[in-house]
C-alpha cells in the first residue's frame, strides 16, 4: 500500500508539471516596494468578490497610494491566504474558492492572497527553508499596515495551507503585536515535525491558533501533514489520516475509469481537505461540524469522548470557540466525503449477556436509528471482539439529522466465509438494554427490548429496541 501511495504521489506531481493556468506568475515579474521594503519578494494581492481568480491589484509595502488604489477597507476584517509548495509555480484550484468563502460570510472584509510562487516552486527542502523569508515578508507587510494606517491587528486572520501554515506562524511571531488568529490548514510535516517552535507554527504566534490535520498518514516526519499538535486547538477529522473519498482504492478506480487526468487531485485530496472543511465552515454557519477532545483516536472510535463539559467539544473552522488551554488539545470528529461535511455522532453501549464461553473476533453488525425527523438504516460497525457478560462501547454517525431518537434495530451479520459451526448452531447473546448518547445534543437515551429481553443471533433477523427511560438522562454528561 505504501508503494502505491508513493507511486500515485509521484504520478500526481508529474501530471501537475504538464498543466498550465492563467494564475502563473513569472519569477522576474517583480512588484517593487518602497525604499525600506526593497527586500520583500512576496506579493500581496487584494482580490475582490468580483474577481476571485486574478491578482489584479497589489498592496505594495511602503507605497501608501497602493492601499487606496485597491480600495482596502480599513474598518473590516482582513483574511490573509498563504499557499503552500507548488511543482508548477501556479496557484492551485482551491485558491479562488478560499477567497470567495470569506466574502460570502463577511462581505465587507479584505481577502489578501500572498504570492510566494517563485520560492514555493523549488525542491521541497529549499521551499521549506524559504518559509522563514516569506514569514518575514508577511510580518513586515502587516507591521507597515498597522503603523502607517493604524490598522488593528485584532482584525487580521492568517490562513496558511501546508508550508504556508508555517510561514503564517513565523509571520505571527514577528509582528509588533499579535494578530488575532492563525488557522493552520494541514501544516506540512517533513522538515517541521521535530522543528523548534520559532521555525514552525506554534500557539504563541497569534492570540488564537487553530489547526486542521487531515493527511498525517505515515511515520512522524514523513507524513505529508504534521502529526503533533501545534495550536491552541488541533482538530483531526476522521483521525487525521485519509479522508472519506480520498483513499488509494478510489484513485485506482478513477484511473481505470477516467484515465490519468484527475489522479493528481486524488493524490492531494486528503491534504487539501483541510481547506474545504474550513470553506464549509464559512458557507454553512448554521450547521458547524462539532469536534470532541480525546486522548487518542482509538478512544474516540469507541465513542468514549462525546462530552461537551468544560470545553471538551468545539466547532470546527470559522466559528470555533477560542479556548486557550495550557497545552494543546487534540480533538476528533467524523465527516462526510463532500460538502456539507457535518455528521451526527452517537456513542452506543451494549451489554452482551449469555453463556457462550468463546470470544468472537472482528464481528460485523448493523444498526438502524429512527428519529422524529428521519431515519438512518443499516449503519455498519465492527467490534474487534465480543464475549458474554461484557459491555462494549462504540461510535457510529449519521449523515442526516434524524431528530430525537425513538427506536433502533440491531443485526448481527453472518461471516463473509462459510462456517460449519455457525451453520450447525448460530451463536447468540441476550440484550436487555442499549444506551445511546448523541454528541451534538448531549442527550442520553436508554432503549429496551420490545420483548423485555432480545435474543440476538448471528445471521438472523434484526432485533428491535424502543425508548424505555426518560428520567434525568439529559443533564450535562460526564
UniProtKB/Swiss-Prot annotation:
Residues 246-269 are annotated as: Essential for determining substrate specificity. SUPFAM superfamilies: alpha/beta-Hydrolases, Lipase/lipooxygenase domain (PLAT/LH2 domain). It is a peripheral membrane protein. The apolipoprotein APOC2 acts as a coactivator of LPL activity. Ca(2+) binding promotes protein stability and formation of the active homodimer. Interaction with GPIHBP1 protects LPL against inactivation by ANGPTL4. Disulfide bonds join 57-70, 246-269, 294-313, 305-308, 448-468. Residues 420-424 are annotated as: Important for interaction with lipoprotein particles. One of its GO terms (molecular function) is lipoprotein lipase activity. The modification 3'-nitrotyrosine is found at residues 124, 194, 346. Residues 344-467 form the PLAT domain. It is linked to Defects in LPL are a cause of chylomicronemia syndrome, also known as type I hyperlipoproteinemia. Animals exhibit reduced body mass, growth rates, and increased stillbirth rates. PANTHER family: LIPASE (PTHR11610), LIPOPROTEIN LIPASE (PTHR11610:SF3). This is Lipoprotein lipase. It comes from Felis catus (Cat). The lineage of its organism: Eukaryota, Metazoa, Chordata, Craniata, Vertebrata.
